[in-house]
Amino acid sequence: RREGMKVIEDACHAIGGTIDEGDGVSAVGACAYSDAAAFSFHPVKTVAMGEGGAVTTNDETMAGVMRRLRSHGIRREPDGFINTALATDGGKTNPWYYEIGELGFNYRASDIHCALGLSQMKKLDRSVARRAELVEIYLDLLAPLAPVVRPLGRRGGGRTAWHLFVARIDFAAAGISRGDLMRALRECGVGSQVHYIPLHLMPAFQTGAAEAAFPGAMNYYEKCLSLPLYVGMTDEDVENVVRSLAAAL
């Protein structure tokens, strides 16, 4: 931002979290360090509305542009009309008039989706708190599996939203591949996933750069495994996940 660039915050996993940089605590989405923050309300997210999302910003100009672009570029504010001769009659704005001043999109969420999302927002703090409780149980139960299993746990500087619970696993030391471990967990009724495959490995983003150019991403990717974490989990569910993981290793 010091260089005049816009900073867009990817907050898709972070709703309900906070940032504490020592000079005060701010909610994720308050845009204390960014120009805009984007959230996802996909079915597996902490706030789920079927499909959709939201963008927050403190920039009124940016907010106005986004409001127009989400609905076909339509402008209904008289002070922004370009074709004033069509917009007015006898000095008064025609009540039906609107303009499309730029090509936009249909990014409008339905009223039904929004109603679902609003009801989920009312439970956000409770949801984040429960996720944090489940993570603490995970961390305690996984401790004996170190150093083969090292969960990405607590961090300082604010409240983590805990959309995902990721463990770094030394598959070579365990003598099992990630695929075989996931299959073994599935046989025990435990789902697991990999979040995520680095973008530079995707054909759409490959530019000829060697994997060595992204050693951090590859080091994380080769060892990461997401374990179940959702509000409906019980303490016993977490115990079963860890028990199944230990048996598979």
Regions found by a protein language model. Name each.
Residues 6, 18, 35-36, 191:
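Proline-centered loop/turn at the N-terminus of a beta-strand
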